[in-house]
Swiss-Prot record:
Belongs to the TACO1 family. Keywords: Cytoplasm, DNA-binding, Transcription, Transcription regulation. One of its GO terms (cellular component) is cytosol. It is found in: Cytoplasm. This is Probable transcriptional regulatory protein BAPKO_0024/BafPKo_0025. InterPro entries: Integrase-like_N, TACO1_YebC-like_2nd/3rd_dom, TACO1_YebC_N, Transcrip_reg_TACO1-like, Transcrip_reg_TACO1-like_dom3, YebC-like. Its main location: cytoplasm. It comes from the Bacteria. Pfam families: TACO1_YebC_N, Transcrip_reg. The keyword Cell inner membrane does not apply. GO terms for molecular function: DNA binding. GO terms for biological process: regulation of DNA-templated transcription.
Length: 243
């Protein structure tokens, strides 16, 4: 009986992990397809596609899936038109959210986002009400279990990075967006990053206690459960015990 119970638990956990992975792949495929449609299928000349493919590789997406998504984008993606929408919103305790979406149905997405925000104690803001709290920068993230903090700092600054932020065993290298490709190429001669993209960086982060932070994280996770939501950017300082 206990063996059967254990197997059932393993199956449930595996099913949940598979479902989560499939959801991530769906979002990444959509982003790759749109990037290829807008900027072409050449990774070297299409920065957005290059970032999308890099994310897909980090997520261990099969190469065949990536190539099919690019071909679909180049082919025009007939029959489906996606729209890019970024909702500005507030979570409880004044935490700012930028909810980036890719959708083929604006009304559905708007309704879903509003519903989840309302249930989680948040609300939609007006355009410009939240975006001013973030600035656009190049972001390269390294795992400090793999590399020495001092080593990353030394080379990143030498290669032209603007700043290096360290927290929760990660080093975040910040660059001017115009210098991002150059700095990343130089860094790749020394290190392998966990993530690299042009990102929205919060100007200031909000610190909350563990219970409050958990409420915000749950709201963000519920938003990201929707296929239409590609990413939720926030200005919450995640407590170390929750990272």
């Amino acid at each position: 009986m206990s063996g059967h119970s254990k197997w059932s638990t393993i199956k449930r956990k595996k099913g949940a992990l598979d479902a989560k992975r499939n959801k991530i792949f769906t979002k990444l495929i959509r982003e790759i397809t749109i990037a290829a449609k807008i900027g072409g299928g050449d990774i070297e000349s299409n920065p957005r596609l290059r970032v999308a493919v890099s994310k897909a590789k980090v997520a261990n997406m099969p190469k065949d899936n990536i190539e099919k998504a690019i071909k679909k984008g180049i082919g025009g993606n007939e029959g489906v038109e996606y729209f890019e929408i970024t909702y500005e919103a507030y979570a409880p305790y004044g935490v700012a959210l930028m909810i980036k979406c890719l959708t083929d149905n604006k009304n559905r997405t708007s309704s879903d986002v509003k519903s989840v925000l309302a249930k989680g104690g948040g609300s939609l803001g007006t355009p410009g009400s939240v975006s001013y709290m973030f600035y656009r920068k190049g972001l390269v993230v390294y795992n400090l279990e793999k590399y020495l903090e001092d080593e990353i700092m030394e080379f990143a600054l030498e290669f032209g990075a603007e700043d290096i932020l360290v927290s929760n065993n990660e080093a975040e290298v910040i660059t001017n967006p115009d210098d991002f490709d150059k700095v990343l190429s130089l860094l790749r001669t020394k290190f392998k990053e966990e993530m690299a993209e042009i990102a929205l960086i919060p100007e200031n982060k909000i610190s909350l206690n563990k219970e409050q932070a958990e409420k915000i994280i749950l709201l963000i996770e519920k938003l990201e459960d929707f296929d239409d939501v590609q990413e939720v950017i926030h200005n919450l300082e995640i407590p170390e015990e929750l990272s």
